[in-house]
Amino acid sequence: MKHGSLFSGIGGFDLAAEWMGWENIFHCEFEEYKQQKLKENFQKSDSYGDIRNFDSRKYKYKIDIISGGFPCQDVSIAQQSKKLGGAQGINGERTGLWKEYARVIREIEPGIIVFENSPMLLIRGFERVLCDLHKLGFDVEWRCFFASDFGYPHFRKRLYGVAYSRFKRWKDIAKSGGILSKVLPKRTPRQIPISIPLERFNSQSSYDNVRMDDGFSKELDKTVIHGFGNAVIPEIPYQIFKAIEQYETNRHTQAAQAGRTARAIP
């Protein structure tokens, strides 16, 4: 599989693709620190900055899967208390960059898109995402996952969506039961007590405890923490990618069986 990521952060989707043995073709990230980490960790990938300046037409028909979590600031709960009119939703300056995500999809025409965002997107502009993807020829499924569902010691509820082309080899995914229904294990780790001692991360006193050993400024430390705080948990896209690849394996198996059956008919 050939994979490209948008709004790549520090590379959660890219790492999951690497775990799968897929080829990371490109990543696209605006923030300098995150872009630096991407270049360090995925040196064979093409690297791009501001998505608004990303001309993706060179990748047309060359990418199987595009992934990424477009900005959620304008739909998140945190925006409700701000003085700028509250959450602006899909029309906001940051979350509104979805239109660039859609543009890249239109230019590249991949088979599958995997995206991530705040669950609040469901009531603050998700219909725009669905409408745009439908116009581009994709069917969409979506589901909210908790980090704790995958054994992590925090909840962090996030929305994940998988869109697949109605005109390519993935067009029958819906008939097979979809992708996201196959992601979670039967037993949910969220219900299992976690034996990791956790302290409440609180205010300045706690912040001082996570300063770097090399003596860099707190502002740089803050950038590092921000990078990890906004990152997707790689295990979640990894499980989604595994379900996608399993569909591919099943499709090839069924095609081979059908071929053998056809040859056996006198």
Predicted regions and their residues:
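Conserved active-site and SAM-binding loop architecture
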Residues: M1-P266
